Amino acid sequence: MKKFVQDLTVTSVEMLSPKHVLLKLMADKPLPEITPGQFVEVQVDHSPSTYLRRPISINFVDDQKNELWLLIAMVGNGTRQLGKLKPGSQLNCLYPLGNGFTLPADSNEKMLLVGGGVGIAPLLHLGYVVKKRGGTPTFLLGARTREDLLELDQFNQLGRVFITTEDASLGEKGFVTNHSVLQKEKFSRIATCGPKPMMMSVARYAKANDITCEVSLENKMACGLGACLCCVEKTNEGNRCVCTDGPVLNINQLLWQI
């Protein structure tokens, strides 16, 4: 898939929580085809501490507005700078990078989208595309507390939403794999993104129940093009660069001890 380096215009900066910001970026021409699960690498600036581009999952794509959304956790100097951008600013982006989630071949296929923390980001776009193709996605979203649950209104517009929080402030108490919906219903496909322990738990559930499952890995990366090899993941097919062979991989490819 062809990649582009473009200056995109910031049209909106919305603080979703003290730690999370939603940037909406507009291109001056039609966006390329973007598969749910792909990501961008953004250039913060050219100072030594933030010289390397930051990989950010694509949260949503609005083709009518030539706009893409980036949901960002402000955890370091680079991402905190992104949170300080103003509408009208320019952000240099390399995109679309990596692969994406496999879409259901049948609109009747029962698909579960499991996200934890800011790992929910690519699932909004995925759920939108699944619904657009005639499907009805089910979301299972987890967080430590209700304040960490993001974009719930948007998810509720796309399908059913089930929630867990560790402190029981919203939804069922506990982790996503403890939610009662997993005991009550059967799913044929799972897509998940979030903290690695959560994804491993989801993968364990999927394997035990013979469910096709893909995970979106969040390995640290730099170039986004498979050249620097800092994002390598060991698989049963050899070493794979998460930035080019991923970030989405089938759990049967992984060497996780689950």
Residue positions per predicted region:
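Local cysteine-cluster metal-coordination motifs and their immediate loop/turn environment
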Residues: 218-247
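Ferredoxin-reductase
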Residues: 2-87
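Short, basic/aromatic-enriched C-terminal tail that caps enzymatic domains
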Residues: 1-4, 239-258
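Short, Lys/Arg- and Gly-enriched loop/turn segments at beta-strand edges
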Residues: 48-56, 98-105, 243
